[in-house]
Amino acid sequence: MPVPALPRLGLGCAPLANLYRAITEEEAEATVAAAFDAGRPVTYLDTAPHYGLGRSEERLGRALAGRDRASYVLSTKVGRRLRDLEPGETPDGQGFTDVPDRARVWDFTADGIRATLEGSLTRLGVDAVDIVYLHDVEDHLPEVYATGFPALAELRDQGMVKAIGFGMNHSDVLARLVADLDVDVVLCAGRWTLLERTAYDDLLPVCERRGTKVVVGGVYNSGLLADPRPGAHYDYAAAPQELLDRALDMAAVCGEFGVPLRAAALRYPFAHPSVVSALVGAASAAEVRDNTAMFDHDIPDAMWHALVERGLLDPDVPLPLAASLAAGE
């Protein structure tokens, strides 16, 4: 089946599961409502069992209750199956706070893939999802090739999901999987950004050749491109001074054209024609509105050329110029 039409901006729903800080049920529901009510409706929503040990899916399901299922695109992930804790066990939040009494189990068997998806459907309160990604499989490739992907492909063939693929931040592994398998779409985090071109060199060429769609995440590289300052994070760790300086220089150039660095970071991945959507997380309605405002911010072509001229973008990479973006809408 073809990949469902995706809006350019999607909502990453990990923050709904108390990622790094707790939010209330009301805040989670308001976040999702704001996505639908935005001037540019954010109607692609991505979640996973991993996010808060099922809490993201549960909260998203409650927030979507009563909405027309045809009005949004929904993706989740498989590879980590959830189970109830045994007596004496404690949950491992892995960055999520106030999590349910569950544990994650890597499971790429056919039965495990199906059970994981069925659990997600129950938590989400829906009969089907549109896209299913195999999640963070870089250390499990033999199992993926032997059973995980074939099981997911069977679900696609049976019409239980519309599109299948992989989601991770290792673009080289994604490139190999796209080359080897019948992959509809990939979710690549943090590897095609203002600061990181790895995916441009390894993943995007094979996706363009194979007709595989690309959803990008991590456009701010863990925060450095959202707020470049001492102590900012890059790929989940403190940003090296060299990258901090480069981000600050980029922010200065963008500022000369009246453009926030966040707006440039969110727009940039669409320079490549294989990129169809960008997922950005939000933990409040205000953050959703800010994301949409950043995405719709006017960016003159001259700003992109200035970044190249000052050595802040490589001269061989494509630029998200207005004419090319308009053609892709």
What are the residue ranges of the model-derived segments?
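Conserved, mostly hydrophobic/aromatic
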Residues: 11, 28, 45, 60, ...
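Beta/alpha (TIM)-barrel catalytic core signal, keyed to glycine-rich beta->alpha loops juxtaposed to Asp/Glu
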Residues: 137-329
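N-terminal binding-site loop/beta-alpha segment at the start of enzyme catalytic domains
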Residues: 1-72, 80-84
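Short, acidic/polar
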Residues: 22-37, 109-123, 169-176
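Active-site groove signature of glycoside hydrolases
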Residues: 121-140
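Acidic (Asp/Glu)-rich catalytic clusters
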Residues: 63-69, 122-125, 177-181
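Short, flexible, mixed-charge acidic loops at enzyme active sites
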Residues: 85-96, 229-232
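Structural preference for beta-strand elements that scaffold enzyme active sites
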Residues: 6-10, 42-44, 71-75, 128-133, ...
